[in-house]
Amino acid sequence: MDKNDIENAYSNTIYVSIGDAKYDYSPKVLKTIVGSCVAIAIYSEVDGFGWLSHIMLPKAINHKSNNFKYADYAISKGIELFKIKGYKMSNLTAKLVGGAKIYFASQDSIIPDIGKENVLICRKLLMENNIKIKAESVLGSFGRTVFFNLKDGSLFVKCFDGTQIVL
């Protein structure tokens, strides 16, 4: 990799912050870092359009919350975006990354496993909207850095346990 490759990689990368979502077309790369949060990547193979959201919590406590940190709100807005752009949900694919159990507690603890809850609600909402989940790297006890390549819809995942995978 030479200097031009590195500069192109940086100029084509869009960072998605916690509680946010971004979308773009190929050749962009969308990037985020998750622990118990979940990165939701939705992709159209037709034209390289992709959307990445970084959710923190499963559901907004009140339905007045306009915040991408909640899976229910973020997924509904992502679907709305794809519909406005004319996409059929059945032609889209999704990939999920994250949902780790970062905060360890005793077995009797009343602290919920928020990572697992995040993964479950994302799966449920995507399936209810006829979006096929093509791949996942979820749960476990480690965070992950996600690079969503809009050229081909692949996710390069660098796990904090030292492993790397491509979804």
Model features per residue range: what roles?
Residues 95-100:
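Glycine-rich beta-strand-to-loop/alpha-helix junction loops that act as flexible
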Residues 17-22, 101-106, 141, 145-155:
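Glycine-rich anion-binding loops of enzyme active sites
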Residues 30-85:
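Conserved mixed alpha/beta catalytic, RNA-binding, or beta-rich assembly cores of soluble enzyme
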Residues 20-31, 36, 44, 116-117, ...:
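N-terminal intrinsically disordered, cationic/polar leader segments
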Residues 1-32:
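Phosphate-centric recognition/catalysis
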Residues 115-167:
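Divalent-metal-activated hydrolytic enzyme cores
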Residues 1-12, 62, 66-94, 105-138:
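Alpha/propeptide regions of enzymes that mature by internal proteolysis
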Residues 25, 44-48, 149-152:
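Short acidic-glycine loop/turn motifs at beta-strand connectors
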